[in-house]
Each structure stands twice: as structure tokens, then as C-alpha cells.
Amino acid sequence: MKFNAYGYSSFKCDITSYCHPAGEVNTIAVKVTNEGKNSRWYAGSGIYRHVWLIKTDPVHLDEWGVAVRTVKVTDDEAILAIEVDVLNEKTESAEANMVITIISPDGEEVGVEEQSVNVDAAGKQTIAFSLPVKQAKLWSVDTPHLYKAKILLSSGHEVLDQISIPFGIRTISFSAKEGFKLNDLSLKLKGGCVHHDNGLLGAASLDRAEMRKIELLKANGYNAVRC
């Protein structure tokens, strides 16, 4: 059904055509073959990242198909550019409606945009938005403010798909003269290189263990990590 030779990257598998009708039992089996030398250290074996079963309408948001960029930042507002890929797996064209709502770090609604969507049969359509955010709170190493882009795809009164994407509003730049700048301020990267394991917990990625790892790195003066 699906073969993936690299354990560090995410991948997806469409199992629609293999599923039994509603009411019947479906069994998902994963076989791991770990043969030969694959690393200079023990990299673990088996399923050591999260696995999700995703159910969508034939007309849906593309997995990993949302991009949020900060185009411009002033004292008064920030301008966001958001692109969303919509897939249509039907044999006929489809019409839908998309609404993007921006939620501030404080949980307040700070922006809403809406567009109609028309996707060809078995096609993909990229929908582009430009949204202003007044008095934006910028993301930085010391103040990691995170906004959310809530994307809702619907047809009539039926919700086809929805997703919430966390993101930070910030500007970055590089130059030979001034180096790396975050939000127009010079920032020296103090990086660490870590393997993906969590010591005695093994290679499995546990949410709290990953957060603790970052907390320890930051407490020791690091502001960049290579995993």
C-alpha cells in the first residue's frame, strides 16, 4: 500500500480504496524492516512519531498545503500573505467557500477574510489571501507570541474541512554587512545540535519530553537548534 524509506520525514497514505464499508471492521497493519547499518548511533526502530487517521470530504484542504508569511510590519499593523491549497478528488468540478479567521495570542478574533473556491475535477486550486493585523505582537526568541489561522472550507451549510495553523508574525533578513536580523534587530544564533532521542525514554517523540528538551536548551543560552 505504501513504502517509506526515510523515518525522519512525515508522509501520508490514502487508504480510501482499501477500507471496508461502514459497519465492518478495518485493520491497519504497519511492518517495520530495520536491516543493515543506517546510522552511526542507535536511531530506534518502529513507530516513533505521531500517527493520525484523517477523514476528509473528497473536496478538502491539502495536507501541508497552508503557508502563512509576514509581508510587512509597521508600528500600526502587519500584513499577512496566506496561501491555501484545495484538492478536489471528484470526477466533476466543485464549488465551495473558504473563511480564514485570525486569532491573537490573547484568544481574540483580529481578522476575517472570505473567498469563493472553484476547483476543477481531480484538480488543485491555490487560494491567496492578504490580511492586515492591527497592533501585531511580534514573535521573537524572548517573546514567542503565536497567532492562529483558522481555515474553514464549506459548501452551503456543510463543513467540508477545517484546520488551525499556529504562526508567528515576524520579519527576517540576511546581509553580509549586518548578518541575521529578526524584527530588524541583529541576532547572533547560538545553536546546538541534538539527536532525536530522549535518553532513557528512547526514540519515541513524546510531546512533553520534546518541550523539556527545548526548555533546557533555552535555559542554557541556546536560541537555535539543529535536530
Predicted regions and their residues:
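Exposed aromatic-hydrophobic patches
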Residues: 10-17, 124-132
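Short glycine/proline/serine/threonine-rich loop/turn segments at secondary-structure transition edges
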Residues: 19-25, 39, 93, 133-148
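Short acidic/polar inter-strand loop motif in beta-rich domains
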Residues: 33-39, 154-160, 184
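Conserved, mostly hydrophobic/aromatic
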Residues: 51, 84, 147, 184
